[in-house]
Each structure stands twice: as C-alpha cells, then as structure tokens.
Amino acid sequence: MNYLDLARNQIQNFRSSKVSQSNLQEKTKILKNLKILTLSFKSLPPSKENPIQAEFELAREVNELEMELSCLCKNERAFELSYLQVKPFYFDYIKGILPKQSDKYLYYVGLYLLFLLSNNRTTDFSTELELLDIRDKKNPYIKVSMDIEQCIVEGNYSNLARLKNSNDENY
C-alpha cells in the first residue's frame, strides 16, 4: 500500500464516525498520524518537484479535518493555524495544481470569518472578504458572517439573535 492509499484509508477511518467527546482522543491520534504522513508528500511546498494533485487534495482535506476537530475542542489557536495552512489550497494552488472545488471550501472560510468577528478582528475580516468573488459572497456560510458583521457595525444587536439559528452545529 502506497502512502496516498494509506492517507485515504486514515481519512476514511477518521470520517467513519462523527467526532464527539467520547472519541476525541482517537480522532486526535488519527489526525496526528495524518499530519505526519503529509510530511512524506514529496510535491508539497517548499518542494521544487512537480506538483502531484492527489497529494495536494489529501493535504487540503487533512487540514480541513483539523479545523473541524479544533472547533469541537474549542481550541482557537489550533483552528486559526489550521485555516492558515489550508488557505493556500483554496486561493493559491487552484491556479494549475488543484481544480476549482465545489463550494465546500466556503464552509471553512465562513467559519474563519466568524472566528475573526468573535475576536473583534474586523480588519482581518474585511481582508478575507476581499479574497472572495461576488458569487461566493452569496453563499449562506459567507452571508451569515457578513450579516453578523453588518449588525455589529450598525449596533443592531437584536438582529444577532435572529442570526443565531443556523443549520450547522459548528456555526
């Protein structure tokens, strides 16, 4: 079994059951092993070798899993570091290495935007929004962040309660 198949199997193992408080240590161990495994990916930066699309896709997914796990653990530092590691996969590597993925990445960008707002980092929030195109800003995960920011700017805190109910538990 090659290293890519091993990574795919570990990702499948991670996703086989929902992350909960009861299996948190097991999921953390799997993720740690996945992060170590991605170090063996020969084409990831700062390598000068030709990029291998499968390695980039798996590395992106490992960082997304880490973001999800850090949300559950309420570890803000790990969440931010995970986002900063996955961000190039969303905005930089799509030029010639990774195909433009579905809107799945907007889920993670939206979480990060909420993180920035919750830490009163409105300048960073605005900077991140500028990376998105107009179509992306209409996505529900991005729109809720923009609506919350608008309520904060206007001082309209009564509308924040209305925005509180979202379809996703991480939001």
Model-inferred region functions:
Residues K18-S22, C71-K74, L114-S118, I152:
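Hydrophobic/aromatic side-chain positions at a characteristic register within alpha-helices
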